[in-house]
């Protein structure tokens, strides 16, 4: 048995929320829903709403960009990313494909056109983004 220490855990996390919000009172009124159930029962005060240029792929790309930039990561050295969302863009192509395409455009000038070529991307079906180096 080896005495080598193995480090396991989450080193960093990034989340992107849209900047637009709707007050939960307005939401309840428009949906003819019970505000007290939403506010007191679920603890909701407001709901974020994607702007016209935002979708699950752009929000995921923003979160991953924040992780890469904040930690000074070289995309060529990222071995695996776990990307997930509860809301797919279409039924034919994983959202992770769109995210990696955007990230490649963002980092290709600095790290090369194939900077994510050796990165395995796992598309999950729940809201999560992880990077494994």
Where are these regions (language model features)?
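Active-site metal-coordination/substrate-binding segment of hydrolases
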Residues: 102, 106-121
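Short Gly/Thr/Asp-enriched flexible loops that form oxyanion-binding sites at enzyme active sites
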Residues: 91-101
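Short beta->alpha junction loops
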Residues: 51-55, 122-129
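Short glycine-rich or small-residue beta-strand-to-loop segments that form or flank ligand, phosphate
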Residues: 79-87, 123-125
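Conserved small/polar residues in nucleotide/adenosyl-binding loops
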Residues: 131-133
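Conserved "HGTGT" condensation-loop signature of ketosynthase/thiolase-family condensing enzymes
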Residues: 1-82, 100-108
């Amino acid at each position: 048995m080896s005495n080598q220490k193995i480090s396991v855990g989450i080193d960093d996390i990034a989340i992107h929320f849209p900047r637009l919000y709707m007050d939960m009172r307005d939401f309840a009124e428009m949906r003819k829903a019970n505000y007290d159930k939403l506010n007191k029962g679920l603890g909701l005060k407001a709901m974020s709403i994607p702007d016209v240029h935002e979708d699950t792929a752009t929000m995921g790309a923003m979160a991953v960009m924040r992780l890469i930039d904040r930690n000074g990561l070289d995309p060529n050295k990222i071995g695996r990313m776990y990307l997930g969302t509860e809301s797919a863009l279409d039924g034919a192509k994983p959202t992770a494909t769109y995210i990696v395409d955007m990230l490649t455009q963002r980092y290709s000038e600095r790290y090369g056109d194939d900077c994510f070529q050796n990165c395995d991307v796992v598309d999950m079906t729940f809201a999560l983004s992880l990077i494994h180096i």
